Amino acid sequence: MLLRSGTAFGGLLLGGCDRLSRSPTFEGILASADSLTYRVQRLLVGNALAREFTPAELSPVFRSNGTDDPDTDEYNALRENGFVDWRLMIGGLVARPLALSLAQLRALPQRTQITRHDCVEGWSAIGKWSGVPLGTVLDLAQPSPAARFIVLYCADELEEGDGGYYESIDLIDAYHPQTLLAYALNDKPLAVGNGAPLRLRV
């Protein structure tokens, strides 16, 4: 009886959550709480830098993270010609939409940092990342004052036929000095397993 009652209560709770999630008032409360969370986080952490390490502390192996071989026709064609035809496309709420090649990105001011990657899967590794600060590229595109977030579309597929993986970050994180569009890991061009041709490091 206890199990059945608990199951029924859980069903009611979930049903209530579903109704709440469709309520404009409840959505407003959640949005306010989300905004407050961001403000408190920024107040406590600010623009603090992540710890940087020495070359002697580099991990001997830097595992693949995510899809280690995006096996799509488009990606394979780009990989076969060394990503010469690949472009970083920037659009949306910007004054200047951009299509930047790897050569153009490499011509921008570079930053190198030795930082630790802490994966949600429970492993970590220290790597030397080189690339262009994301803020530098965003400044070229001139985001609109209305822009608050950026959405990044990746070569990784979520699941067969489900489309590409994407992620988003706010502009505060995008402009953090250590947020990097990395094209090299440990002084070598990014390998496919590490996100070639370009990986965002936040």
Language-model regions, residue ranges each:
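N-terminal export signals
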Residues: 1-20
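Structured, non-membrane catalytic/scaffold regions adjacent to prosthetic-group chemistry
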Residues: 20-202
